[in-house]
Amino acid sequence: MDLHLIFGPTCTGKTTTAIALAQQTGLPVLSLDRVQCCPQLSTGSGRPTVEELKGTTRLYLDDRPLVEGIIAAKQAHHRLIEEVYNHEANGGLILEGGSTSLLNCMARNSYWSADFRWHIIRHKLPDQETFMKAAKARVKQMLHPAAGHSIIQELVYLWNEPRLRPILKEIDGYRYAMLFASQNQITADMLLQLDANMEGKLINGIAQEYFIHARQQEQKFPQVNAAAFDGFEGHPFGMY
């Protein structure tokens, strides 16, 4: 079975790469993003829209309401193994995402060392200026999406349920938006009515938060097997 693994920090174009590869190969993409398992966080977690998918198939490790919390890495890893097994007859699958905890679960498990041909695309963290330009563009799109709710609309809706607030405070983007509202002494719904100057500050702040997260991801990712090449058979992270 061919497994195409696309991973790297946030805001480095992994989803775009995965969609292009799916168009080329006809294979489905399985997201390795634990936050994307919550449809209520579609925009803020970076779930691509139907239009962005361009006719390709994208799968998720779970479909759960936020009140159940973000799926744990071990559970996500178990679901990942199940999905790979379910698609074995199709001959291949594209795995795409940046969950360091999930990727490290893979690195520690011998399951991935047998019967797979690996094709690995590792997106690296660019310099800060390049990253911030891409991140700001992404955040602006999240604030004004072509389809669906904006990240702020998602936040406002979920904020109305107090028990969800601690979960939101653990997720990049939503966390900074809540901090921004607090610092400026405004309510969450007032974030929907920001002038251009204030919105620019919000965009920059969220992008900065993404950059901090991306640097942390880069430090926590498991190392790709030094012996790996395109079509390599063995453990992708060289642990076994």
Swiss-Prot record:
EC numbers, comma separated: 2.5.1.27
Record field: catalytic activity: dimethylallyl diphosphate + AMP = N(6)-(dimethylallyl)adenosine 5'-phosphate + diphosphate
InterPro entries: P-loop_NTPase, Tzs
Protein's UniProt keywords contain Transferase: yes
Signal peptide (from-to): none
Keywords on record: Crown gall tumor, Cytokinin biosynthesis, Plasmid, Transferase
MF-aspect GO terms: AMP dimethylallyltransferase activity
One record GO biological process: cytokinin biosynthetic process
Pfam family, one: IPT
Enzyme class of the recorded protein, top EC level: transferase
Family: Belongs to the isopentenyl transferase family.
Known function: Transfers dimethylallyl groups to AMP as part of the biosynthesis of cytokinin phytohormones.
Name of this protein: Adenylate dimethylallyltransferase
Species the sequence originates in: Agrobacterium tumefaciens (strain Ach5)
High-level lineage: Bacteria, Pseudomonadati, Pseudomonadota, Alphaproteobacteria, Hyphomicrobiales
